[in-house]
């Protein structure tokens, strides 16, 4: 008689090691990585500004917000203004 087969644990899943971007492409002048985001958690505001064309946008944030959320709000506001 043989031994019973042992069950193996599945290999552990790999965690996401990448980080989210903090520099973005400006929708006005189209320069890559020219927009920097500053998150002011004390005042609950996020400010994104372009270093080339000096365009600036400010939006309210929450404790869960990330720089990409501020950028997406800016893009949404630009699209809403165009319509």
Curated annotation (Swiss-Prot):
Zn(2+) binds at residues 26, 29, 50, 53. GO terms for biological process: transcription elongation by RNA polymerase II; transcription-coupled nucleotide-excision repair. Keywords: Chromosome, DNA damage, DNA repair, Nucleus, Zinc. Its main location: nucleus. It is found in: Nucleus; Chromosome. GO terms for cellular component: chromosome; nucleus; transcription elongation factor complex. Belongs to the ELOF1 family. Factor involved in transcription-coupled nucleotide excision repair (TC-NER), a mechanism that rapidly removes RNA polymerase II-blocking lesions from the transcribed strand of active genes. Acts as a key adapter required to anchor TC-NER factors to RNA polymerase II: stably positions UVSSA and the DCX(ERCC8) complex (also named CSA complex) on arrested RNA polymerase II, leading to neddylation and activation of the DCX(ERCC8) complex and ubiquitination of RNA polymerase II. This is Transcription elongation factor 1 homolog. It comes from Homo sapiens.
